[in-house]
């Protein structure tokens, strides 16, 4: 049992509508909108990812973000790892899912942008646990399409598999990532 109620998913039509994309874009500070080069902006509260380049919108996707207690970190980061056909390691149990296919929790692509080696105390749904060592946050696909639009992950940003494939092809190591509340 989670210690708090999970936020409801954003209505699917709102998450997918071009109006919500334009509202998200308009809500950005001008210096973010006009930043040179290609960069990713994650609007965590809107559960929306934007890929901008020289002030132009290149891609926009609905996403899932971290659940209460596992919030996706905010701040300025950069892509430091890209993996085609990643291996998933459960952040609590250490269980590895190496086989690729429809059940891999990371989908077909992984794009890492944040690493935290301070450890943390977090709730796993049933109890409080302590995680020692490093955790990495990134963008990845999901076999669970129903999760997109919700705050439901362990901190990572989930996209539909077809969307993470497109994003993977558009970013490189060093691409700037800004995560806003």
Residue ranges of predicted features:
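N-terminal pre-domains immediately preceding structured catalytic cores
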Residues: 1-181
């Amino acid at each position: 049992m989670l210690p708090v109620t999970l936020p409801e998913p954003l209505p699917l039509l709102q998450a997918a509508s071009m109006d919500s994309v334009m509202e998200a874009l308009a809500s950005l500070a001008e210096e973010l909108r006009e930043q040179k080069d290609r960069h990713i902006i994650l609007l965590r509260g809107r559960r929306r990812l934007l890929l901008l380049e020289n002030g132009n919108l290149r891609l926009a996707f609905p996403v899932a973000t971290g659940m209460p207690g596992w919030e996706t970190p905010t701040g300025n980061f950069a892509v430091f790892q890209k993996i085609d056909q990643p291996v998933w390691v459960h952040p609590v149990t250490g269980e590895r899912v190496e086989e690729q296919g429809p059940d891999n929790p990371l989908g077909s692509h992984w794009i890492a942008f944040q690493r935290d080696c301070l450890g943390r105390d977090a709730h796993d749904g049933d109890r409080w646990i302590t995680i020692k060592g490093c955790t990495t946050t990134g963008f990845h696909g999901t076999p669970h399409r129903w999760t997109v639009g919700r705050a439901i992950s362990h901190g990572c940003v989930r996209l539909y598999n077809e969307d993470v494939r497109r994003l993977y092809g558009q970013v490189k190591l060093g691409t700037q990532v800004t995560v806003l509340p």
